[in-house]
Amino acid sequence: MAGTTAEYISHHLSFLASGDGFWAVHLDTLFFSLLAGVIFLFVFSRVAKNATSGVPGKLQCFVEIVIGWVDGLVKDNFHGPRNVIAPLALTIFCWVFIMNAIDLVPVDFLPQLANMFGIHYLRAVPTADISATLGMSICVFFLILFYTVKSKGFGGLVKEYTLHPFNHWAFIPVNFILETVTLLAKPISLAFRLFGNMYAGELIFILIAVMYMADNFALQALGIPLHLVWAIFHILVITLQAFIFMMLTIVYLSIAYNKADH
């Protein structure tokens, strides 16, 4: 049982990859990330195309509520033009939420479906892959630099990282180290927070699925309510993690855009 269990867990934690080592490309992560993006674009474009000024349908009401909610958050937290940040925040929340929600699909369904087509390894949750979350966080990192330069100019950027928090030339090396660590900590923490929560959630689903392989009927039966309870709780987790990623992105960009010295 131990060997079978170890192989089962290892199989479910293996990516469909092209290449080896650092340069390996996780094809399953790319596919499901793109699929989540297509779903988001399809739903919102369809609602926009069929939008009516009369009595809206349920889907239009839901989309309008989400858009209004995100726009309100951006308005309250980003003190600058919202024409780019609001759509960005909406895209981040919906895209990350859809990628997270794939974790609610039974752990064996998609791998077994892929196996029918000769694909022996498949991980379906993109946000449980550190390469995906780091990729998104690196994009946020460059946006932070862009909005810092846009707000303060290149000279302001240099000043911020050399004369803060100690406004004296003698502390320039210390200031630079402190501010660089602070800057790099933002995307790293953003990536690992999302990855850690989704990886743990995926692993718990796999461990619960292992219970169905047990020889003990009572243990098999216990897996059903545990699976249901964790799935219900996980709905909160996937929503909260999408919200946190979006919210921290808004806050980081707001800090970068703020013309006042920090």
Curated annotation (Swiss-Prot):
Membrane-spanning segments: 24-44, 84-104, 129-149, 194-214, 228-248
Molecular function GO labels: proton-transporting ATP synthase activity, rotational mechanism
Location of the protein in the cell: Cell inner membrane
Membrane topology recorded in Swiss-Prot or TrEMBL: Multi-pass membrane protein
Pfam families: ATP-synt_A (PF00119)
Keyword vocabulary terms for this entry: ATP synthesis, Cell inner membrane, Cell membrane, CF(0), Hydrogen ion transport, Ion transport, Membrane, Transmembrane, Transmembrane helix, Transport
CDD domains: ATP-synt_Fo_a_6 (cd00310)
Covalent S-S links between cysteines: none
Biological process, per Gene Ontology: proton motive force-driven plasma membrane ATP synthesis
Assembly and interaction partners: F-type ATPases have 2 components, CF(1) - the catalytic core - and CF(0) - the membrane proton channel. CF(1) has five subunits: alpha(3), beta(3), gamma(1), delta(1), epsilon(1). CF(0) has three main subunits: a(1), b(2) and c(9-12). The alpha and beta chains form an alternating ring which encloses part of the gamma chain. CF(1) is attached to CF(0) by a central stalk formed by the gamma and epsilon chains, while a peripheral stalk is formed by the delta and b chains.
Function: Key component of the proton channel; it plays a direct role in the translocation of protons across the membrane.
Protein name per its UniProtKB record: ATP synthase subunit a
Gene for this chain: atpB
